[in-house]
Amino acid sequence: MNFNKLQQISMNFKKKQKAFTLVEVLIAVSILTIGILSGFILITKVLYNTAVIQDRLTASFLEQEGIELTRQVRDSNFLQIMDGESVEWNNRLEDGSYTIESKAGSEQSVTLVSVDPGEAPNFFYDNDTKIYNYNTTGEPTTFNREIKITTINDDEIRVESIMKWKTRTIDFNLTIEDHLFNWLKF
């Protein structure tokens, strides 16, 4: 009788042990699944943030280029004045909104085109030259740049470079401001 009782206790223990092992497997699978999903979520967020950072960096370079090209127009005016030409220091820098683009090798290397405020066209990206431009020969991008010029007084203008772009489904914008002066007092 004792033997049967021991055998029954042993069988009950084995049954409990199998159920306990199944619970362990379920917990292990759950932990593994959570770990893998967390890894995928982390990778997805890293890839998204990388795209956002890359686009923000591109936008900041294009934005700075807009300010520098506007400064180049002012400096070209100074050079023309020094050569005896009759132009104002702020020639081609009238109040308004513009797109601005540099064309290497052309006689007038910087082109300002008037646009309605907030309506600047998107850039195209030329894979061969690695240059953003307004020509339709490259790939369309979501970047657009508006240069807003405001006269402060006879010797000062405010230049705002306003970048707008979209990364995936989120709209971004970035604005920098600079002041250009008639520092040569022409």
Where do the model's predicted regions map?
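Intrinsic structural disorder/low-complexity segments
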Residues: 10-11, 57, 67
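Aliphatic-rich helix starts adjacent to a transmembrane/signal segment
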Residues: 20-64, 77
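N-terminal leader/signal peptides at the extreme start of proteins
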Residues: 1-20
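Short amphipathic alpha-helical leader/targeting segments
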Residues: 4-6, 40, 49, 53, ...
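Low-complexity, Gly/Pro-rich coil/beta segments used as flexible assembly/activation regions
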Residues: 61, 67-186
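Short secondary-structure boundary micro-motifs
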Residues: 4-5, 14, 33-34, 43-44, ...
